[in-house]
Amino acid sequence: MVNTRAEAEAMVRSCRYFPLGNRSNAGVRGEWGEFKNYRDYMDAVNNELVIVPMIETNQALGNLDAIAICPGVLLIGPSDLSIELGVPLDYQCDIYQRALDKIAATAAKHGIAAGMYFIPPAMDPNFFVQKGFKFFTMPWGPWAKAGIENGLSGIKR
């Protein structure tokens, strides 16, 4: 979660390697996989990393343009945002909808993607797509469990 441009910039710096940031190399990661040259590994990380600051507070809504200038995407934490707006889990109310519209419009203005941390219960994902949201995280636990159970069910014992 970020609330200011300074926090967003610090987040970006801590995720990227020198010269774009100050991320620790944590040992010999560049030797894992296809990279033989450590600089190539760091450049690949800097170029391919997706940085996702979460927008969950009134302060962040007030600083949205400044936050959106930083490289990355804007991700909404729907529950936390609704609580911060004084409308806990009321995803249909006007206050919440205006906040979503502001976030989607700001992301579009800055040429970045807006996303939702999850799709709130009983809401149609197309509703958010029509507002301009481009990606959604999904609750992976139940899906992973179903996939594992499905895969294991085919094993003859």
Where are these regions (language model features)?
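C-terminal helical cap(s) of enzyme catalytic domains, especially alpha/beta-barrels
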Residues: 5-21, 129, 141-157
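Non-membrane alpha-helical structural segments and their capping/turn regions in soluble enzymes
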Residues: 5, 61, 93-101, 145
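Non-catalytic positions within long, well-ordered alpha-helices that form the structural scaffold/packing
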Residues: 68, 129-130
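Conserved anion-binding
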Residues: 1-70, 78-83
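Hydrophobic faces of well-ordered beta-strands that scaffold small-molecule active sites
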Residues: 51-56, 74-76, 114-117, 135-138
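Alpha-helix-loop-beta-strand connector modules within alpha/beta enzyme cores
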Residues: 16-21, 43-46, 92-115
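Glycine-rich phosphate-binding active-site loops on the catalytic face of alpha/beta enzymes
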Residues: 1-7, 74-85, 133-151
